[in-house]
A protein has these predicted regions:
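Glycine-rich phosphate-binding loop of actin/hexokinase-like ATP-binding domains
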Residues: 31-118
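Short glycine/serine/threonine-rich phosphate/pyrophosphate-binding segments
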Residues: 2, 75-79, 173
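Conserved active-site and cofactor/substrate-binding residues in soluble primary-metabolism enzymes
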Residues: 3, 44-52, 107-110, 121, ...
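Conserved phosphate-binding loops in N-terminal lobes of ATP-dependent enzymes
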Residues: 1-22
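Active-site C-terminal subdomain of aminotransferase-like
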Residues: 94-99, 109-110, 123, 130-138, ...
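Short glycine-enriched loops at secondary-structure junctions
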Residues: 20-25, 133
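Adenine-nucleotide phosphate-binding core of ATP-dependent small-molecule kinases
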Residues: 128-182
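Short acidic/His/Gly/Ser-rich catalytic and metal-binding motifs that mark active-site loops
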Residues: 26-29, 139-140
Length: 183
């Protein structure tokens, strides 16, 4: 969002203005703490899209509302919006929250450690699995939900199971954000 606006403005010789930053860090301190002090949770998600969508579609005054917003693209971020601030959200890029069309999402820690030390993958390959070659594409060879839905209509049970799992994981993340808003 922000980089694209800057590029277009530069080409046109004008200034660019955006309403929200592409990434923002408004997370509650308690939301950052994990079971390993050297691995805090980070605020990396689709902030610009989430805030704009909330303002446009909630039908309420955003700054006076508590909302849960799910951005569902190649990466999926689910944010708890409390009175205009996103106080908790999964890191949609680095392996937190639901898996997505091309991102791995949360992975059981001990299983990931086994894979890391298996000698079968390089560091770069594993980072790609987390951020661009994981999720639905790792199971089905495509990141297109439309193609997966077509496969399901043709009777592909594996495609149905993977898409059901994606939806299930998004639903769980929405539930987690409901708990974050309840305090």
């Amino acid at each position: 969002g922000g980089l694209l606006a800057a590029q277009i403005a530069h080409m046109a010789g004008v200034k660019a203005y955006i309403a929200d930053p592409p990434v923002v860090d408004e997370m509650d301190d308690v939301a950052r703490i994990t079971g390993m002090p050297m691995c805090p949770r980070k605020s990396v998600f689709h902030a610009l899209n989430q805030k704009a969508t909330a303002r446009l579609h909630c039908g309420l005054v955003y700054e006076e509302s508590n909302l849960i917003v799910a951005h569902m693209g190649g990466g999926i971020s689910v944010g708890a919006h409390r009175q205009g601030k996103i106080v908790d959200v999964n890191n949609a890029l680095d392996g937190d929250g639901p898996f997505a069309p091309d991102r791995a999402g949360s992975i059981p820690s001990s299983e990931l450690i086994k894979v890391c030390f298996s000698g079968q993958y390089t560091r770069e390959e594993l980072l790609k699995y987390i951020s661009s070659k994981g999720g639905m594409v790792a199971y089905l060879g495509t990141n297109s939900v439309m193609q997966v839905m077509e496969r399901i209509e043709q009777g592909d049970q594996r495609a149905k199971k993977v898409l059901d799992a994606l939806c299930y994981n998004v639903s769980k993340q929405i539930g987690a954000m409901a708990a974050a808003l309840a305090g």
